[in-house]
Amino acid sequence: SSDVCSSDLTALLITQTGGGCRASNYIHLLRKALVKAGYPQIPVASLNFSGLEKDSGFQMTLPLARRALACIFYGDMLCALRNQVAPYENEKGAADKMVDLWVERLGRVLLAGKGYTSKEMKHTFPLIAKDFAAIPVTRVPKVKVGVVGEIYVKYSPLGNNDLQKFLESQDCEVNFPGLMGFVQYCAFNMGEDHVL
């Protein structure tokens, strides 16, 4: 146990699309792994809109969905700007420091229940962009690499063997598609399934 986080006060939340991908099975594997690791008291709840795991104890409400979407927008923006600036920055680490600064700022704002409305986001997005634009860079031609694939493998350094770090060490500009595209894909598929 940690001083910061008690396993008795911890729960895991996993998203499930309800589609045919293997990620829909991860919740069962997580539960088995927690029991095997000695943490049977930690519940694993499912976040989905397709009716899976109806008794998971977690219900998505409209206000919570709005907050989650705002966080995805902010996260996508920070990742995109960081990846556009970092390969060209004059001072190594400046883009990562800017990400950390904005994660801290946004964390305080969001925890205070602000920053979720369209008006607040429209105010904040240009401020974030302005801060990244102020980082001194030297634009030189670089190979641009787009990373696609399964969500976990694409975004997790553990799952992709630190692919972004490797590509950047090879003097590449790395681009990950935003998570919002996946959210839109899931929403569209749900709509299509309903029509069918």
Tell where the protein language model's regions lie, with residue ranges:
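An N-terminal assembly and electron-transfer interface module characteristic of large anaerobic redox
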Residues: S1-L196
